[in-house]
Amino acid sequence: MDINNNIDNITNSNNNIEKNNNINNFDNNNNNNNILYISSSESNNNNNINSSNSSSNNTNNSNNSSISNNNNNNNNNNNNNNNISIEGNTANNSDIKVGTSLTNSIKSFKKLFNNQKSNNNNNNLQVNHFQQSQSLPPSSNTSPTFSSTSPIIIVSDNTNIESLDLEINSNNSGSIGSNNSGDNNNINMNYKSKSLSLNYSILRPLCDTDNISNNNNNNNNNSNNSNNNNNMSSSDNNNNSNSNNTTNGGQLKRNNSSNNNNRYSIGGPLKMSNSSDFNDYLLNNNILYNINQPNRKTPPPNLMSVLKNSFTQYTPPSTTLTSPTSTRNPNRLSTNLSNVTNISSSTSSSSSSLNANNNTNNNNQQLQQQQQQQQQQQLQQQQQLTKSYSVSNLMRSQSSSSSSQSPLIQQSDQVTFDYDYIYRRFLRSRSELTLPSWDNAQYEGDFDTEIQDTLTRALSNGNLPSDNKRQSLHLSTESTTSNNNNNNNNNNNNNNNNNNNKSKTDDTTNSATTTTTTTTTTTTTTTTNSTTTTTQLNNGKNLIGLVYNDKDEVIAGERDKIIGLFTDISKVTGTQFLEEFLFTYHYYMTSVDLLENLKGRFNNPLMDQAAQSISILEENHDKVKIEQLSTHIRLRVINVIKKWIENHGYAFATDINLYQMLVDFIDGDVMSFSQRWGQYLKKAINDSGCLLRYIAVNVKEASSKQLREIISLDNLDAISKLMSQSLQLKERKKGLKVIKNSFTGNEAVEWLINKFNLDSKDEALETLSKMLQSNLIFHHSKSGSSFSPSSSSSSTTTTTTTSSSSSSSNTTTANMASSSSATDNSSSGGVVTSSSSSSSSSSSSPSNGNGTTAITSTSLPNSISSSNSTSILTSLVVNSNSSGIANGSSTPSIPSSVTSPLTNSKSTLNSTPSSSSNSFTFKDKSTSIYYFIFENINFPEPIVPKTFFSSPNSTFSITFLDIHPVEIARQLTLIDYELFKKLSPTDFYHTAWSKPDAKEKVPNLINFINRSNTVSYWVATEILSSSNIKHRVSVLKRFITIAEILRKFHNWNTLTGILMGLNLGSIQRLKKTWESIDKKQLDSLQNLINLTSERLNYSNYRKEMSTPTYPCLPFMAVYLKDLYFIEENPDYLENGYINFEKMKMISKVLIEIKRYQTEQYWLKKIDAIENILKSVVLTDKDLYKASHMIEQPQRTMTVGSNLKAQSFLTTTTTTTTTNNLNNNNNNNNPNNNNNNNNNSANNKSSPSPSPSSSPITSSPISSLTINNNNTISSNLSASTDSSINTKKKSSFLMFGKK
């Protein structure tokens, strides 16, 4: 190696080396960039760094390590290969890239040599370790230790390092120089009689800024040799040098044959532009939190043992090693040599430089190939470490495995180093051994990835319109309402009626008056007369029986007049008005009365309001028009019934008379008017789920004869759905196939005979054969290559059915999606609903010959349970566009998909069997396997602890803190949402939840309210379940984190339940626990409290909810409070008119609730976690006792007579005075009653603890008694018990009272 004479001028950085004798301190530039790695060698041979020529090699074999100089020749070094011997081996054809670390080390040796020549004695170099002289950890004898001062000297040795003695001898002329005539320069060191080799290596590849600029002096081919022993001679050979000072990722190779058991390697993604930033980051910034020594700013030594396992995960096994520069051995710490690195120093006094020549040595190519083969073998033998189950690590692993090259190859100028990941693994390994069990899982962060995954999958599985789906998560768009004015734009005759369609969707009632006439001329005349009449009546505001506001909206009226608006062709009533009516008609009429009224208007269309517009036509003797108007009115009645069935089918699930009346009306009157419309309405009953709800509620215990009266054997759709929910479905094997959701032939026949009271087996086989031919069920031989009907193997999985039936070229298809669930098939892998064209929820409405759809709608998913006693809300309606009859025909044209929909099935999961399945005949055999097809739901993958996989069915192996907070939030949301879906509008009528018989009348709403209160007490129970304050702090922090996640899930109801639990008096009084919560989490908690605060009538919450987001679980207490105040208004006005303004306000609340029921959370149910979340909770009184046992109030308390004073002090840790103890121990003495009473009075009147450190001042206790059996009983003062007040307050809010 060439060493310039003026190496003194090389920049030094913070070289604070303690030294003996006359060693001077180096310059300090406040940069800790000096790293010298020294490894020990037991051999007596000299390990040297040499520069050799081809002529001869003179080796200094003296026992004393020395630096010899041979100044014999001055040669040009252009044609010589510089070999660097490291640890006794030669790395040929390698280019050194050295930064300030090596230059400072060389400068140190040069100064040591100069001082040695002048003083003729040995120089000792003191090396401090961790600011002290101490030994390396015994368990990590190969782990480098870091010095807190500069230069950092990393020493690998088992002994205690106190000093490093450098004995420097000059054998020849006494100068340090470069001998280019063939002699070697030996740099040897003695350390406690051991021969050490200098191993200059940096912890990471050096970058551009580490290079020292070179001053290339051309034609400078002579070495400066003189008789001065203190000079350093060198030759600057840069005439034809191709050295590159800007090479990135330079690395120093270490011989693989020596010390191959190194336990650490390089790699990882720490983004640093240069080594100076890296050293500052590693040494100065306290990034890696120290465990053993708080003042250390470097990773602890034990962390190095983890680096190997951590780094290897970032090196794909398929990495291709193409060159020495791209070679990366994960089992090595030393860096590779890459390209040319010149070390030079440009000063005002000299242009000398320290160069490393970049000449190719072809003789070393074979050695390089051998090294590459060894590295490839190591990569192939490398075993990956088992990774964590967290989503973030999974994503990190996927992104790493997807790349074909290592990070060093992809980014040679930017080496990454993931210290955060390493440190988490290091903490995990230590915590499993030393930390308590509740600190095992460290769940920290905002969990944006998991939350986004949950909401994204919920939206992808849902059936909301695209406009509503865009209003999810962070897409804060304004609430959109359907405002389709297609008919108004296409029909200029209705321009005067556009004012009645503000913020409403077009209804069939609007379109029926404009598009169904024989000729254009006649239509114009009829519409003009109707419009004129309507305008006069609305302008005069003098309609008998109706009252309008300034916006031409009905605010009051008689019952018959309001119903007449839906059938009056002279009025244009939007869908919103119809929805408001259907939501609130229970206030002034029964469902039977409404159906009777609609039947009367269907059979006698020319009545009431219609007579006013018909009288003009009778004068002109236009009988054709009268018949057409009668048809329009009947179609309007059908439209009302259609909306009633699709969106309010819950009304037919509780009243057998109503259901039977509806079926009779459809089979009789509607079928006689239009057979196709009758079939459509009957299908709508099945699709809306009201039939299944009716069976679940009313026919669960009924006889089979009654069931057959309701469902005929021709109604294959209903039979298929009922079978899928009642018949036990299992996973069966047939040959090499595994068929899910399957049943045998004999099971189906037996079920059908028992349920429908069939006389013979042939009748059951005939019905099942029709279902098989209609693709409602499938034979196992036609399951195809892909059959996994159920979406998951979870014990209970909610699925929905979504299919579509094709429509004709002149027909507009309306997709009606519905879903139902039952609890009978939990063993088959889910709550299921069959999917086929006839049993699917998709159907086409009867359409007209002119290509327009007569009645279309889209109902969105709703889920029911056969075990529930009441139904739930059906789905939100996306209203129709137009309706009418063309060519004067009274019978609309219905596509074949309605009358014969059984041949248009479409499976969403399995490959649909071919049409050849129609040739199958159902066989009554136990070996014949059939199955249902269900939709595959894209559920987010559960995040469960590792112990869950070892014992998934055991609830004792995992605790609350072992579960990921995101998964806890998911399961809490799933539990509450299942209860939320079961609510129906009838549960909210007349504040039924506040009545004494609420449990019998509205059990679903009461269960939902009780669940919210249970969550509050469960939160308090989990916090108070341990007397260890660290455990309580961990649980409290976890609940704050879960609350933040629920806020992002838009689960406001569960969020408020957790906040109320944290606000209970038994929790608020835990002063020491609250003091351990950091300010960041307290601020986050306060923000959540402000959002859900009832201040200004929940103004903050209402502002957040002003923009609808889906999915969402709203805070039910706000709706109950609004309904409570609305109900204070009268149902009828003084003149006997219905207060329809009140009905509009009620319907607004109910429509909003219904809207959030249409888009559900698609989550997997995990029973083990649900059992933990539904664990036993303590009562309010028990919670308060437990709270005082954990943290005693700082006041005097009474003690039972049979308890010794010492036991009391030990048990309660309460400061009591001797006088009080003596008085309390004399309770059996009647003479001391007065004294005891006085003491109790004094205790009650004593001041409460200061609230400065606690969020809410703790409530004082009148007395606490410890009985003989070590049980604690407390006498609480009702006036001072804040927890009891909190309970009353929470119930007050949930019931919506003032």
Curated annotation (Swiss-Prot):
N-terminal Ras-GEF domain boundaries: 550-689
Stretches assigned to the Ras-GEF domain: 964-1193
Skewed-composition ranges (Polar residues): 473-482
Parts forming coiled coils: 352-389
PROSITE patterns found in the cross-reference section: DEP, RASGEF_CAT, RASGEF_NTER
Compositional bias annotation for Low complexity: 211-245, 315-384, 483-501, 508-533, 783-864
Region feature Disordered, mapped onto this chain: 1-26, 46-88, 211-271, 314-384, 459-533, 781-864, 884-920, 1214-1267
GO cellular component entries: cell cortex; cytosol; nucleus; plasma membrane
GO molecular function, one term: actin filament binding
Presence of the UniProt keyword Calcium in the record: no
One GO process term, biological-process aspect: Ras protein signal transduction
Matching CDD domains: DEP (cd04371), RasGEF (cd00155), REM (cd06224)
Domain DEP: 723-801
Keyword list, A-Z: Coiled coil, Guanine-nucleotide releasing factor
Function statement: Promotes the exchange of Ras-bound GDP by GTP. Seems to play a role in chemotaxis.
Protein name (record): Ras guanine nucleotide exchange factor Q
Native source species: Dictyostelium discoideum (Social amoeba)
Gene label: gefQ
